[in-house]
């Protein structure tokens, strides 16, 4: 979690498809090939623990994956760029005193001083300027070199939501709201949008002066923060719960329960992730065998890695709560659909980084 009693929970698509009907909170190509020289003499045909042979990021990790992971962040001074085109500085933008605007064909470079050699993540806070409604794409270079395939295809999502309330026609069928962009400040790590790697990309930097370059592939964006970030290892559940102060986070209301319907999501990463309906099961809420009642979200449209749906929930006090998700994956027989759970933008522990939904025609409740 980058430093910066309402809790926002986001589920991110990783592999195929799942449907979410209820969210219950309980207590308790611009193809670039300048990375080829980096692997001159290296056997790129060797398999890497089952990873695709043409994935140069796998080879990159073979070369640098055992390097140190320094603990300090390196903040990039956005306005001290050394080279730029399609860039402008804006003041008083969406609550920020000063920001950097990138056009859809922009390119900007900064010189950064890295205190310690090792592996780092790249973290960004951006505002998705309204344009054509597609994901924002960027390429990232270190010292003029694309480190690996995938660093030239970084995707940053937009934010969508409902324009209006659910309406009914004269037959009692519910009409889903129109989807509109609801841009807001977003935070993200540079990562593989295809989902082959669920963790953020790890970039290797030598200590001393380095030049980093951020290049637009499509769509404009506004940036308020860019960080060469220390890699925080995600704890397992045992480590996570052991670190919780049980005296501070002690629930007084042990009977608390809150149900949030899946179709009542607040924000989404794509306009196709709207509320829809299922009339095949009486376990859905609301249910009608004859009329259209919006009682789920996702479905066949929720199949692209990195797509997310967000719900806002409010809990009465700091404490430990259980989260249950009612979902169904009945589209791909023999496949497992995985989802990650984020609380306030953070995956709390490893076990919720890939929650599996196996093929089944029945809805299942996972806690």
What spans do the regions from the language model cover?
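Extracytoplasmic
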Residues: 4-367
């Amino acid at each position: 979690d980058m430093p910066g009693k309402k809790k926002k929970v986001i589920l991110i698509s990783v592999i195929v498809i799942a449907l979410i009907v209820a969210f219950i909170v309980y207590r308790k190509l611009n193809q670039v090939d300048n990375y080829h020289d980096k692997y001159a003499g290296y056997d790129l045909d060797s398999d890497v623990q089952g990873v695709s042979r043409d994935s140069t990021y796998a080879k990159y990790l073979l070369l640098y994956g055992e390097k140190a992971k320094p603990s300090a962040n390196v903040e990039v001074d956005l306005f001290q760029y050394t080279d730029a085109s399609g860039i402008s500085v804006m003041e008083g933008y969406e609550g920020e005193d000063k920001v950097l605007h990138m056009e859809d064909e922009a390119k900007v470079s900064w010189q950064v001083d890295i205190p310690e050699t090792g592996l780092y993540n790249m973290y960004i806070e951006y505002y998705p300027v309204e344009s054509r409604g597609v994901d924002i794409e960027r390429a990232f270079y270190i010292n003029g070199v694309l480190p690996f395939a995938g660093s030239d295809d970084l995707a940053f999502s937009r934010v969508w939501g409902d324009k209006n309330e659910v309406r009914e026609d004269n037959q009692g069928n519910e009409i889903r709201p129109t989807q509109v962009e609801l841009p807001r400040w977003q935070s993200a790590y540079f990562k593989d949008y295809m989902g082959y790697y669920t963790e953020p990309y790890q970039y290797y930097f030598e200590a001393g002066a380095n030049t980093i370059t951020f290049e637009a592939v499509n769509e404009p964006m506004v940036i308020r923060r860019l960080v060469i970030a220390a890699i925080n290892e995600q704890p397992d559940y045992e480590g996570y719960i052991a670190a919780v102060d049980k005296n501070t986070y002690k629930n007084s209301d042990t009977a608390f329960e809150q149900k949030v319907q899946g179709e009542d999501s607040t924000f989404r990463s794509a306009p196709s992730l709207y509320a829809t309906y299922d009339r095949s099961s009486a376990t859905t809420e609301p249910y009608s065998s004859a009329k259209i009642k919006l009682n789920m979200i996702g479905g066949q449209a929720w199949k692209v890695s990195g797509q997310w749906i967000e719900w806002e929930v409010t809990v009465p006090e700091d404490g430990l709560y259980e989260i249950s998700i009612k979902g169904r994956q009945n589209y791909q027989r023999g496949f497992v659909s995985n989802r990650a759970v984020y609380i306030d933008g953070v995956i709390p522990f490893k076990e919720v980084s890939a929650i599996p939904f196996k093929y089944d025609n029945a809805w299942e409740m996972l806690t």
